[in-house]
């Protein structure tokens, strides 16, 4: 079920404070966060946010098309190694 509109989007407080302070100073620094559940708001456009995927922080550059999505959507947590090739020679 979707979040109620009267509540507004969830953005972690510490992340919102960092974004607002960087916007006030006019700086563009990489912001490290573990908050994958935070929703991207228009104030984040143009910033690079390093989102934790369980092992490392992956840098994500925020564009206008990402607004409304969650930060965790852009930092995959699982590595796909590929399916095993069908080796018919070894079966015989």
Swiss-Prot record:
One of its GO biological process terms is: ribosomal small subunit assembly
State the gene name recorded for this protein: rps19
Q: List, in alphabetical order, the Gene Ontology terms for molecular function in this entry.
A: rRNA binding; structural constituent of ribosome
Q: Which Pfam families match?
A: Ribosomal_S19
* Classification via Gene3D superfamilies: 30s Ribosomal Protein S19, Chain A (3.30.860.10)
Q: What are its GO cellular component terms?
A: chloroplast; mitochondrial small ribosomal subunit
The record's similarity note reads: Belongs to the universal ribosomal protein uS19 family.
Q: Entry's InterPro entries?
A: Ribosomal_uS19 (IPR002222), Ribosomal_uS19_bac-type (IPR005732), Ribosomal_uS19_CS (IPR020934), Ribosomal_uS19_SF (IPR023575)
Record localization:
Plastid, Chloroplast
Kindly state which keywords UniProt assigns to this record, in alphabetical order.
Chloroplast, Plastid, Ribonucleoprotein, Ribosomal protein, RNA-binding, rRNA-binding
The protein's job, in short, is: Protein S19 forms a complex with S13 that binds strongly to the 16S ribosomal RNA.
Q: Which residues cross the membrane?
A: none
Q: Which domain of life is it from?
A: Eukaryota
- Protein's UniProt name: Small ribosomal subunit protein uS19c
């Amino acid at each position: 079920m979707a979040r109620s509109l009267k509540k507004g989007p969830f953005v972690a407080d510490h992340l919102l404070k960092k974004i607002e302070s960087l916007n006030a100073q006019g700086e563009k620094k990489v912001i490290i966060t573990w908050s994958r559940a935070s929703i991207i708001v228009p104030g984040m456009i143009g910033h690079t946010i390093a989102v934790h995927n369980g092992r490392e922080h992956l840098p994500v550059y925020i564009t206008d098309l990402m607004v409304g999505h969650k930060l965790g959507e852009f930092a995959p947590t699982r590595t796909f190694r590929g399916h095993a090739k069908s080796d018919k020679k070894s079966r015989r």
